[in-house]
């Protein structure tokens, strides 16, 4: 059976396919979702953001992280352009590493209601100490292959 042609970008509520201004803050950013055509199948989808940036809420200095987001979709998939815009909205947002990482995970869960989600925030050193932050919604569905996030611990020259 032929598929229905996609709606034109102008009539779609999604940000995908349209010129969209960068959101000024995470609160203003919109996360879009699209129907999961494989909703009866448990599988893992992964987003990797190796150049995530936020601001230290005390000094205003930039903080950098490598984020890895894994989730088992339910009825919805997270649309990647909206995720890119959401993550970019943190560039001028002040928050501690732990708050950024957990808030991103919770916001995605609220938007798409996955069966399971985990996020790893691998933050580059500030003051000589790297901070790695991990959060997940609970146990992964049984029988789902969950690959390692495969981000090595930060290591200096030693």
From Swiss-Prot:
Keywords linked to the UniProt accession: Cytoplasm, NADP, Oxidoreductase, Queuosine biosynthesis
Chief site of localization: cytoplasm
Gene, per the UniProt record: queF
Catalysed transformations (reactions): 7-aminomethyl-7-carbaguanine + 2 NADP(+) = 7-cyano-7-deazaguanine + 2 NADPH + 3 H(+)
GO biological process: one example: tRNA modification
Function text: Catalyzes the NADPH-dependent reduction of 7-cyano-7-deazaguanine (preQ0) to 7-aminomethyl-7-deazaguanine (preQ1).
Protein family according to the UniProt entry: Belongs to the GTP cyclohydrolase I family. QueF type 1 subfamily.
Protein name per UniProt: NADPH-dependent 7-cyano-7-deazaguanine reductase
Lineage of origin: Bacteria, Pseudomonadati, Pseudomonadota, Alphaproteobacteria, Hyphomicrobiales
A Pfam match: QueF
Cross-referenced SUPFAM superfamilies: Tetrahydrobiopterin biosynthesis enzymes-like
Binding site for substrate: 78-80, 97-98
Active site: 56, 63
A GO cellular component annotation in the UniProt record: cytoplasm
GO molecular function, one term: preQ1 synthase activity
Localization annotation: Cytoplasm
Organism, scientific name: Nitrobacter winogradskyi (strain ATCC 25391 / DSM 10237 / CIP 104748 / NCIMB 11846 / Nb-255)
Associated pathway: tRNA modification; tRNA-queuosine biosynthesis
